[in-house]
């Protein structure tokens, strides 16, 4: 998404590897800060205070996730941490299924919030509610094509959806 439009498609994997390696090196530098999106911390704290069981299903390695969570003091809000270190990555549903298993939550009670089409495909494959956010890696159209039940463009809209959430089969899914 961030590569120039005229960048050769056959070189995209090489560019992605370069970016990944540069990011790992940059993250190891003293004082590096990977900021949260504005509104993310407030939403996490509110949901935890209201008794939501929170989990992470990420394409990051556990080491990278821990660096971000330690920097922002987020571990205490989450009950399950699913990373690509222990099984297939997205869009395979294993991370969501493992998170549900660890927390004792059923699919109809589960909401996967993500910023990629792969998050939506993973959620749908696990029969969970698939909510997209437009401020991340994929475009809203790509997220919708991945099967999002809804795509939100601001935390206020996401929070309103979560406030109205009632467990049950995801919209458009069989009961």
Task: Label every model-predicted segment.
Residues 1-52:
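N-terminal helical cap/lid subdomain that shapes the substrate entry/recognition surface
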Residues 10, 46-48, 52, 61-175:
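Asp-based, Mg2+/Mn2+-dependent phosphohydrolase catalytic module
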């Amino acid at each position: 998404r961030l590569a120039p439009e005229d960048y050769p498609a056959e070189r995209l994997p090489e560019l992605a590897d370069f970016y990944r390696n540069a990011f790992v090196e940059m993250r190891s530098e003293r004082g590096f800060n990977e900021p949260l999106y504005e509104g993310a911390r407030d939403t996490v704290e509110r949901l935890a205070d209201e008794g939501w069981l929170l989990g992470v299903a990420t394409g990051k390695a556990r080491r990278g996730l821990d660096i971000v969570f330690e920097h922002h003091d987020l571990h205490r809000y989450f009950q399950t941490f699913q990373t690509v270190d222990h099984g297939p990555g997205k869009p395979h549903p294993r991370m969501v299924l493992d998170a549900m298993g660890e927390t004792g939550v059923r699919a109809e009670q589960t909401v996967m919030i993500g910023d990629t089409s792969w998050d939506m495909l993973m959620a749908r494959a696990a029969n969970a509610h698939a909510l997209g956010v437009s401020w991340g890696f994929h475009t809203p159209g790509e997220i919708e094509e991945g099967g999002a039940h809804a795509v939100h463009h601001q935390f206020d809209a996401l929070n309103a959806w979560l406030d109205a959430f009632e467990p049950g089969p995801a919209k458009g899914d069989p009961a």
